Amino acid sequence: MKQSKRLFRSAWCRKHWLAVILVCLLPAALWAQDNLPSQAVPDRHSVPIYPSREIRELMRFVAVSNPMPETFRDTLDNVITDPVGSLYPFWQKMSRMDHPLRIVHIGDSHVRGHLFPYVMRRCLEDDFGKDAVEDIPVDYRTSGLARETGKNGIVYHMLGVNGATCASFATPERLDEVIALHPDLIILSFGTNEAHGWRYVASEHEAALDRVITQLKESCPGVHFLLTTPPGAYVRNGRRGKRIPNPRTEKVVDTELRYAREHGLAIWDLYDTVGGKQQACRNWDNAGMFQRDKIHFTREGYILQGLLLHEAFIKAYNQYVATRLE
């Protein structure tokens, strides 16, 4: 009992003296603390968190993924070829996005089906904003023309004609329709029907390309162009023969590549990107992306084409942004 009292008394003494020490030291601690100002002093030394042009440009990069199926063989890097930088003024407009930026995608049934270019359109709207157009569902039965709101952003129009070649598309009515949209960029996707002409003549194809581009260039000041090559298709070997990869597709692609090179235009070579002469058709076919006619594509096939175009497009844009950092 006595031991318990001694322990209690000892503990009480320690607490008592600790309290005394704290009371004695408190005034000194308070005296050492600087007086707090009644109002915070403005920070005159810090700078904005993103002060440099390089950082501002770096923030314009757009993330993009590679949609190429792993089962596709002998593919090439998915890029837009533009050695003279013909699209640089367009990329500059895109990086600023201070007005509605109008893209008009013209072509054959691959464009007329709307799915291939619509995937591209939706991806660009996700990248740069969708306020420039009304959110109206698009399918095969609807118009491919976007309805503008007047706000800044991507305006992507789709004008395709079933069975069209570059030559047959170039009627005054259709060209006037393109011109009336005031495009900043025109994407031309022809070639499948040119390749299905049994008597394909490269010089005639090249002349048709030149007529269309020349007329549009004269009527649309400051417009830029992006050519695309066809995805590939099968034809019958004889009237009732087995279907084989269309041997004229390679000639059509060569014509379009040569025309782009000689006239300083940008081109996206879808055909060679997905396997070219040896593998393009086989890759599409093995993936189950052809329809029964082996010319047109399934929903999955057109979605993939739209994603591939978007990837190449954004990679070219990001390359432009990178040059601004140099």
Regions found by a protein language model. Give the residues of each.
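Bacterial Sec-dependent N-terminal signal peptides
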Residues: 1-42
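Conserved catalytic region of serine esterases and O-acyltransferases that act on ester linkages
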Residues: 33-83, 139, 143-144, 288-326
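Alpha-helical scaffolding within the catalytic cores
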Residues: 82-93, 167-179, 207-215, 251, ...
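Conserved SGNH/GDSL esterase-like catalytic core that processes O-acyl groups on lipids
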Residues: 102, 110-207, 218
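Structural recognition of the beta-strand scaffold that forms the well-ordered cores
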Residues: 102-106, 155-159, 185-189, 224-229, ...
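Solvent-exposed, polar/charged alpha-helical surfaces in well-ordered, non-transmembrane soluble domains
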Residues: 114, 118-122, 176, 203, ...
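Serine-dependent acyl-ester chemistry module
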Residues: 177, 192-210, 222, 227-254, ...
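Catalytic His-Asp segment of secreted/periplasmic serine-dependent ester chemistry enzymes
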Residues: 232-326
